[in-house]
Amino acid sequence: MAMSRVASTAARAITSPSSLVFTRELQASPGPKKIVGVFYKANEYAEMNPNFLGCAENALGIREWLESKGHQYIVTPDKEGPDCELEKHIPDLHVLISTPFHPAYVTAERIKKAKNLQLLLTAGIGSDHVDLKAAAAAGLTVAEVTGSNTVSVAEDELMRILILVRNFLPGHHQVINGEWNVAAIAHRAYDLEGKTVGTVGAGRIGRLLLQRLKPFNCNLLYHDRLKMDSELENQIGAKFEEDLDKMLSKCDIVVINTPLTEKTKGMFDKERIAKLKKGVLIVNNARGAIMDTQAVVDACNSGHIAGYSGDVWYPQPAPKDHPWRYMPNQAMTPHISGTTIDAQLRYAAGTKDMLDRYFKGEDFPAENYIVKDGELAPQYR
């Protein structure tokens, strides 16, 4: 079965002092499953668009399908604290579905409590809300809908770059406030053409962003663990930079497109930010925890970072007193870039497809696996 591990692993578990994985295999059986989905509550907005599938009310549009097959589908937005609704279902759920936009943090402690849990699905891209090492050790499968919102995020990143470069937000605020002061905007508004833009990470989203930046005649750089083939580099017009800090020192604009891992958590700390050009613009739609929160605030206050934009925070939802809400020259939003209606349709369909394969004992598309057979996907190692 796609969700089970290889027989040799099960044999090792029999003789192991801790047979958590083997026990889970014994409990896994055909029949109805308890599936829990954690999504944000949309309230009055839930009924405004029939394709608004990513909210708790519409629950990916799969309730009728799941229940027609005899499965139980519990949906809740309540995910934090020992008395939350999610916690009540942890002991006996088989599948947990979450999104990056309202993540259910699956800790090692929760994994230990979830004796029936077999599958963790991310409706979207990015499964860092799961303790992946604990999931691997427990024999769980973790998968996401790879590619479902790459276009959405890349388009959003381009928008944020332009908002920062053109100093758009202060002008917009002037209109709202009944003001008119061209000089207050123009003194720090620039063209994108001719600027050096570097992406930290050039996977699916990073490459799409570089492709969309090419017509702007920028100097395009990228840093990644893997170099693109020469033909693709030439098509995009981007140059590979093996040394991250050397690339960063050249950039007028830095875009973060790397997953959150143990290696990238806090990657942009005070020391690294100090190596950036004074007046650099940063766009981060990857993960908030890649940045040192206070270091970003300090650099924005000093002017070393001239503008910071993104839709990712740590934690999420961001508390009302999160310092990024109040730092100067920021163009922050809630986590929205990857949850356009088009993206919701794609990741809802992808989630349904994986559930269907899971029920049938079939493998998922290989690129969707984040944890399989006790192994993490390369980008998370």
Swiss-Prot record:
Xref: InterPro entries: D-isomer_2_OHA_DH_cat_dom, D-isomer_DH_CS, D-isomer_DH_CS1, D-isomer_DH_NAD-bd, FDH_NAD-dep, NAD(P)-bd_dom_sf
Residue numbers binding NAD(+): 150, 204-205, 224, 259-263, 285, 311, 335-338
Keywords per UniProt: Mitochondrion, NAD, Oxidoreductase, Transit peptide
Transmembrane segments: none
GO process annotations (BP): formate catabolic process
Reactions catalysed, as given in the entry: formate + NAD(+) = CO2 + NADH
Expression induction or repression: Induced very rapidly by wounding, and slower by darkness, chilling, drought, hypoxia, and treatments with formate, abscisic acid, serine, sarcosine, pyruvate, acetate, ethanol or methanol.
Gene3D superfamilies referenced in this protein's UniProt entry, alphabetically: NAD(P)-binding Rossmann-like Domain
Predominant cellular place of this UniProt entry's protein: mitochondrion
Tissues in which the UniProt entry reports expression: Found at high levels in developing tubers, at intermediate level in stems, veins, stolons, and stamens, and at low level in leaves and roots.
Name of the top EC class for this enzyme: oxidoreductase
Pfam families: 2-Hacid_dh, 2-Hacid_dh_C
Binding residue positions for substrate: 125, 149
UniProt GO MF annotations: formate dehydrogenase (NAD+) activity; NAD binding; oxidoreductase activity, acting on the CH-OH group of donors, NAD or NADP as acceptor
PROSITE patterns per UniProt: D_2_HYDROXYACID_DH_1, D_2_HYDROXYACID_DH_2, D_2_HYDROXYACID_DH_3
Span of the transit peptide along the chain: 1-25
EC numbers: 1.17.1.9
GO cellular component: chloroplast; mitochondrion
Family from the record: Belongs to the D-isomer specific 2-hydroxyacid dehydrogenase family. FDH subfamily.
Name listed for the protein in its UniProt record: Formate dehydrogenase, mitochondrial
Provenance organism: Solanum tuberosum
